[in-house]
Amino acid sequence: MTTTQALTVRQNATAATALLVGPALMAGYGVVRLVGRAVSDYGPGVWWTLAHLLFLAGVLAFVPVFLGLRGLAGERGGGRTAATVAAWTGLLGAAAVVVQAVIDLTAGFAAADKQAMSEMFDRVQGVPGVMPLVYTVVPMLFWLGLLALVTLLAFLRRDVVRPWAPVLVLAGTVLMAVNLDLLPVGALCLGAALLPVRRGLPG
């Protein structure tokens, strides 16, 4: 086995694990968030920190997911090019979401109470460019890239990506966008869409 082949096998193994772990961590974030809100202690403190650590880990887990899905498109041709564009679009969005999670964690550690944390967020979000780059526009590329990639593979790799997978990804994205309380359900939709892909990763 060549070095390149060994790296590909390792990348696919990582992607296969991440296809399970990524949605699970996001679901965990949603559950912890709900628990924290239920006990009226969702601000600076344990629940906030735990939830956002799970969120950060979940987003990072999608990095190998994007790379693994891109690899399923083949080595060359228009499909590979389109998959590469979709993957890098998703990764750009993931980078913005990671920054958002780090800001949330930092505010949680630094603030003494919810009021102080809110004031910190106001200062950060008041910096020109921060809102579109970190909170509103660029983070959406994560979901758009994932949806585009899964949709593309549903046509290119019907043996691996089920035809209903893009519908589940879209449903999960919409649920999480409409109401953060639906994060666990949305994450389960993502997991159901991505789980069958694991067997298509060569390794």
Label every PLM stretch briefly:
Residues 2-203:
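Hydrophobic, aromatic-enriched alpha-helical segments typical of multi-pass transmembrane helices
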